[in-house]
Amino acid sequence: MIYWTVCGPHGIIEKGIILREEKVSLMRMKVSDYIAQKLVDEGITDAFMVTGGGAMHLDDGLGHQPGLHCYFNHHEQACAIAAEAYARIHNKIAALCVTTGPGGTNAITGVVGGWLDSIPMLILSGQVRYDTTARWSGVGIRAMGDQEFDITKSIACMTKYSEMVIDPMRIRFCLEKALYLAQTKRPGPTWLDIPLNVQGAFVETEDLIGFDPEDYEAGGTGWAGVYESDPPHATAEDFAGNGEQREPELPKVT
């Protein structure tokens, strides 16, 4: 006997009989695809990239996103300098995507230039799975995963905001925060380091919570516009302000 199956809109169908009902969500997306769509929704039209295994989901999402033009350079330093020059010429922010380890460290020179000259840039870097990072191990080793380097510690001094995104449900908040800070007040680079397991995770987009600029500018975390207290996806760093550089108050000239 030959059996055949087809996928219907509500489940798996065999010979016209529904065998299993499954929840259908038109808003379920892979995080990397959500990032790519979000960039376009926020007005970003160009991305400079060097592909790599540590950023495979990001590379796929950005590379296939309608409305996003991807330029594949031969070196990450060229990507960063191109993103900086793009902002100078077009007066708008571009995205930069690199892989883990040397992919991130190679981009640093161009990011330093963006920091010193107050140029808005959004850097997305791939990272090994979080459960293979030295940070996850908690034992003080320097590296555990293949081609791993905790880049956020190195670029904190040259970015307005940086974070390793380890919770897929934070991705909207982190993206909106990074884009807001990169382009407001004194502009500058912002950097999101995204492990492979987060890049490839699936989320219900309607459950994602965004960043609240008004709360942030009032000295809050950016969550309070949605939650009065104890946001479920907030981290201790949100409350401590780690990974970001708020605008200092300039001394008054008398």
Region spans (language model):
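Short, positively charged and aromatic/hydrophobic N-terminal segments
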Residues: Y3, I12, I17-I18
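Generic low-complexity segments that are intrinsically disordered, proline-rich and/or Lys/Arg-biased
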Residues: H10-G11, T190, E214, P232-H233, ...
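N-terminal alpha/beta PP-like core and its mobile active-site loop of ThDP/TPP-dependent enzymes
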Residues: E21-S229
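Extended beta-strand solenoid/passenger and fiber regions
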Residues: T221, V226-T254
